[in-house]
Amino acid sequence: MDPLDVEDEVDESDTTSLQAQLRQNAIRKQEQFQQEIQERNSMVNRMSAEALQYFNQLHKAECSKKEELQTYIDENLKVFEKKQKRAQAPTKNNERSSSTHAALEEHKAASVTKKKLGIVKKGAPRKTKIRLPVRKSPN
């Protein structure tokens, strides 16, 4: 036997085993993929028509609530913007009423604070300094 013939046989056996490994790997991956598809579809298939209808109703109700909320926000935003424009537009009556209104609020705030009795903290006793003129002695 030639040593070259042995190497050729080894190469052929390695090549075929590599091909077989690749084939087996591809088959295994395909089976795993098919199992994943079955698992994903099995949940939907196991659910009854009533359950599917219930979930669809929940989804529709949620979408309708979102739409209602959005329309409510849009409508109130328009009203708010109108009120804001009115408040920002200076008028003679507004200026007079706002100044008297502010004065009334200050008066009310002062009267409320006077009515409340809270904790009274006494400060440290203050020392009074008495200065006497220094007399110089006649010496």
From Swiss-Prot:
The keyword Isomerase does not apply. Pfam families: FAM192A_Fyv6_N. Its main location: nucleus. It comes from the Eukaryota. Residues 83-139 are annotated as: Disordered. Residues 90-101 have a biased composition (Polar residues). It is found in: Nucleus; Chromosome, Telomere. Involved in telomere length regulation and promotes fully efficient non-homologous end-joining (NHEJ) by a mechanism activated in postdiauxic/stationary phase. Belongs to the FYV6 family. This is Protein FYV6. It comes from Eremothecium gossypii (strain ATCC 10895 / CBS 109.51 / FGSC 9923 / NRRL Y-1056) (Yeast).
